[in-house]
A protein has these predicted regions:
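Carbohydrate-interacting regions of secretory-pathway proteins
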Residues: 17-213
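Bacterial N-terminal signal peptides
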Residues: 7-16
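Positively charged n-region of N-terminal signal peptides that target proteins for export
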Residues: 1-5
Length: 213
């Protein structure tokens, strides 16, 4: 009888764990429908961004594509974010978070997570640009990789293919290495960067998981 009770208890536990994991996975929300740039907004040089074969293709003059959709009213504070990315030789791009739409120029608000495996800028993919930069190249051009960002409170974790490359906590008194203005943990939306006409990058499976404040 005791063995039966243990078996039943174990089965219930496994079912509970399975349900928990399933719910956890289902918390991911897609920000890109794979067909259009609906819910995204770009100002100057809009032709830098287009959709092909379920991907956002970035190639053209300097521009930024901001998420302006209904998920969290495009205002994220604590979250997990991930996207599948492919770079081509010499390409430079970035993923901004805690940003806000602006018509042109480099985003004045938010942090940038670097996408760059072989551009002349030494700050490589996964760098928290100008704040916690990395020189190592963890992934190759012409291959898909997953870039992951998690923000909770003042803490930022960045992973490349599940490898932690940045684990940064913003101090109460921020002393940045470079003049990057509005780079502060706050809240806001995401943006994809079109860096220059020579850079070509693909993005797909752009997902977010909002986390409690």
């Amino acid at each position: 009888m005791k063995a039966v009770l243990i078996t039943v208890a174990l089965a219930v536990f496994l079912i509970f764990c399975g349900a928990f994991l399933k719910n956890n996975d289902s918390d991911w929300i897609s920000l890109f429908d794979g067909k259009s740039l609906d819910n995204w907004k770009v100002g100057a040089n809009a032709s830098t961004f287009r959709v092909e074969d379920g991907m956002i293709v970035v190639n053209g003059a300097t521009a930024h594509l901001f998420y302006e959709g209904d998920v969290m009213n495009h205002d994220f504070k604590n979250f997990e974010f991930k996207a599948d990315v492919m770079t081509f030789p010499g390409a430079n791009s970035g993923i901004y978070f805690h940003s806000v739409y602006q018509e042109n120029g480099w985003p004045a608000k938010g942090y940038e997570v670097q996408v760059n495996n072989s551009h002349t800028d030494w700050r490589r993919t996964g760098s928290l640009y100008g704040v916690d930069d990395i020189k190592e190249v963890y992934v190759k051009d012409n291959e898909w990789f997953t870039e992951y960002i998690k923000v909770v409170g003042k803490k930022v974790v960045i992973k490349i293919n599940d490898k932690i490359v940045v684990d940064y906590t913003e101090p109460d008194s921020v002393q940045q290495k470079v003049n990057i203005g509005g780079r502060r943990i706050s809240d806001g939306t995401f943006a994809l960067q079109g860096h220059d006409p020579k850079s070509k990058i693909y993005f797909k499976n752009i997902m977010v998981k909002p986390l409690p404040d």
